C-alpha cells in the first residue's frame, strides 16, 4: 500500500513539475518581447501604433483562446488540447523566427503563438483540480502562482539581454523549450472520455471580428474599422440571445453593476499594460538607455516586486477588507503616474522606483478586483461571471497596448502642457502619464460606487 501511495505521489509531483514549466514559458512568451518594441520599430521603420501589434496580436488570441480551451476541455479532453496548444505555440515560434524580416509574418506568428500559449493557463488549473489530491491542491496552486510571478519578473531581463547582445528575433524561439514536456505529459495524463456538447463557433467568430476591428480602430482611427466592430458586436449580442449554450451568457448583460465593475477593472489593467509597453520607448527617447538596461535595470525590479506586493495584499485583504487594499493600490497607481509626468526628466533610476509602485499598485488591485466585482453576482451567475472577468482581464491588456501604441503616434499629444518639462522628447510621454492618472482615478470612483450599491442590494 505504501508503495502504491508513493508511486501515485511521485506521479502527481511529476505532473506538477511539467505544468510549472508550461506556466513559466506561457508568461515568458508574453513578457520578453515588450522591451524590444523600440528595436522592432527601428528595424521595420514602423510607428508604435503598428509595432505594438507584436504584443497586441499575441494577447488577442491568448485572451480568446483561454476562454475557448476552457469550454472545450470537457468535450475534447485536456490531454489533446495541451498537445495541440504546445504544437501550435512552437509552430508560431518557428514561423516568427524564420520570417522575422517580414513584419506581416511576424504579426501572424504572434497570433499563432497566442492561440497556442492560451492552452496553458486555461488547462493547467483544470489538470491540478483533476490530478492533484485535494489536500495538496492549495500548495500546487501556490507553486504555479509563484512560477508565473517569477516568469513575469525575469521576462523583461531575459528579453533585454538577448535582444541587446544577440537579436530580438531569438526571443521568438524561447517557447520551443515547451516541446520537451510533450512525451512526459502524454505519458502521465490519463486518456479521457470525450463528452458531447454544443460549442458556439459562430459566437466566437463574431466576437473575435468585433474585437480585432476595434483594436484596428484604436491604432489607425479609421471610422470604417469602428463601424465593422460595432456591427459585429450588435450581431453577436443578437446571436447569443438565441442559442441555447452561448459563448457569453447574455443574462450577465442585465447585471449593470457587474458589467460596469468588469469594465472599470479592465480599464485599470489595460492602462497599466499600456504604460508598461510605453516604458521602453520612453526610456530610449528620454534617457537613451539600451534594451538590456531597460529590461534589467528599469523594468526587472518592478516585475519582481509583484511577488512581495501580492503576498502583502492578500494579508491586508483578510485583515482590513478589499476596499482598503483597492484604495492603496489605486493611490500607488495614480500618484506614481502623476509624479512621473512631472519628473520625467530626472535620472533614469527614478523610473525604476515608479515602476515598482505601479506594478505594486496593480498587484493590490488585481488581488481585490475579483472580490469586488463578484459581490454584484448572484450565486447562479458566479461561474459565468468570473469566467467573463478573467477573459476581460486578459483582453484588456492587449487592448491597452494597442490604444497606447495609437496614442504614441498622434502628433497632437506631443505638445508641452506641464511648465516644468523642458526637453521636447518628454512632452508626449508626460502628457500620457497625466492621462493615465486621470483614467485610474475615474475608474476607481466608479468601481467604489458599484461596490457600495451591490452591498446594499445583496
Swiss-Prot record:
Compartments (UniProt record): Cell membrane
CDD domains per UniProt: MFS_MMR_MDR_like
Chain ranges passing through the membrane: 12-33, 81-100, 111-129, 140-162, 165-185, 201-221, 223-240, 256-276, 297-317, 324-344, 346-365, 432-451
Keywords attached to this entry: Antibiotic resistance, Antiport, Cell membrane, Hydrogen ion transport, Ion transport, Membrane, Plasmid, Transmembrane, Transmembrane helix, Transport
Pfam families: MFS_1
Gene Ontology cellular component annotations, sorted alphabetically: plasma membrane
InterPro entries: MFS, MFS_dom, MFS_trans_sf
Any one GO BP annotation for this protein: proton transmembrane transport
GO molecular function: antiporter activity
Location (main, coarse): membrane
Membrane topology: Multi-pass membrane protein
Known function: Resistance to tetracycline by an active tetracycline efflux. This is an energy-dependent process that decreases the accumulation of the antibiotic in whole cells. This protein functions as a metal-tetracycline/H(+) antiporter.
Family note: Belongs to the major facilitator superfamily. TCR/Tet family.
The protein, known as: Tetracycline resistance protein
Lineage, uppermost ranks: Bacteria, Bacillati, Bacillota, Bacilli, Lactobacillales
Amino acid at each position: 500500500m505504501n508503495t502504491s501511495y508513493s508511486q501515485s505521489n511521485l506521479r502527481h509531483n511529476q505532473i506538477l513539475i511539467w505544468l510549472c514549466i508550461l506556466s513559466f514559458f506561457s508568461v515568458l512568451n508574453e513578457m520578453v518581447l515588450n522591451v524590444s518594441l523600440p528595436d522592432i520599430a527601428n528595424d521595420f521603420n514602423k510607428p508604435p501604433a503598428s509595432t505594438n501589434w507584436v504584443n497586441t496580436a499575441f494577447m488577442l488570441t491568448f485572451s480568446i483562446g483561454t476562454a475557448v480551451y476552457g469550454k472545450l476541455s470537457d468535450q475534447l479532453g485536456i490531454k489533446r488540447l495541451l498537445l495541440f496548444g504546445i504544437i501550435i505555440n512552437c509552430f508560431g515560434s518557428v514561423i516568427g523566427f524564420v520570417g522575422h524580416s517580414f513584419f506581416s509574418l511576424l504579426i501572424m506568428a504572434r497570433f499563432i503563438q497566442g492561440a497556442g500559449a492560451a492552452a496553458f493557463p486555461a488547462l493547467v488549473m483544470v489538470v491540478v483540480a483533476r490530478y492533484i489530491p485535494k489536500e495538496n491542491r492549495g500548495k500546487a496552486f501556490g507553486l504555479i502562482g509563484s512560477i508565473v510571478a517569477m516568469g513575469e519578473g525575469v521576462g523583461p531581463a531575459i528579453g533585454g539581454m538577448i535582444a541587446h547582445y544577440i537579436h530580438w528575433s531569438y526571443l521568438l524561439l524561447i517557447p520551443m523549450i515547451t516541446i520537451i514536456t510533450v512525451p512526459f505529459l502524454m505519458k502521465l495524463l490519463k486518456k479521457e472520455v470525450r463528452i458531447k456538447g454544443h460549442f458556439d463557433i459562430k459566437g466566437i467568430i463574431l466576437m473575435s471580428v468585433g474585437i480585432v476591428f476595434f483594436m484596428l480602430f484604436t491604432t489607425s482611427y479609421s471610422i470604417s474599422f469602428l463601424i465593422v466592430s460595432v456591427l459585429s458586436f450588435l450581431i453577436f449580442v443578437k446571436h447569443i440571445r438565441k442559442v441555447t449554450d452561448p459563448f457569453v451568457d447574455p443574462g450577465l448583460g442585465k447585471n449593470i453593476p457587474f458589467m460596469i465593475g468588469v469594465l472599470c477593472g479592465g480599464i485599470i489593467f489595460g492602462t497599466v499594460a499600456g504604460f508598461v509597453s510605453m516604458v521602453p520607448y520612453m526610456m530610449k527617447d528620454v534617457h537613451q538607455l539600451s534594451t538590456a538596461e531597460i529590461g534589467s535595470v528599469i523594468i526587472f525590479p518592478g516585475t519582481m516586486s509583484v511577488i512581495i506586493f501580492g503576498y502583502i495584499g492578500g494579508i491586508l485583504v483578510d485583515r482590513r477588507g478589499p476596499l482598503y487594499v483597492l484604495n492603496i493600490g489605486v493611490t500607488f497607481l495614480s500618484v506614481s503616474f502623476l509624479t512621473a509626468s512631472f519628473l520625467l526628466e530626472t535620472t533614469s533610476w527614478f523610473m525604476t522606483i515608479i515602476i515598482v509602485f505601479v506594478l505594486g499598485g496593480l498587484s493590490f488591485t488585481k488581488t481585490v478586483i475579483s472580490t469586488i466585482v463578484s459581490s454584484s453576482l448572484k450565486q447562479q451567475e458566479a461561474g459565468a461571471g468570473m469566467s467573463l472577468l478573467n477573459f476581460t482581464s486578459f483582453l484588456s491588456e492587449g487592448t491597452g497596448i494597442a490604444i497606447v501604441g495609437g496614442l504614441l503616434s498622434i502628433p497632437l499629444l506631443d505638445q508641452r502642457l506641464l511648465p516644468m518639462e523642458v526637453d521636447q522628447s518628454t512632452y508626449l510621454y508626460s502628457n500620457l502619464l497625466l492621462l493615465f492618472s486621470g483614467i485610474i482615478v475615474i475608474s476607481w470612483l466608479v468601481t467604489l460606487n458599484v461596490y457600495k450599491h451591490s452591498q446594499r442590494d445583496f
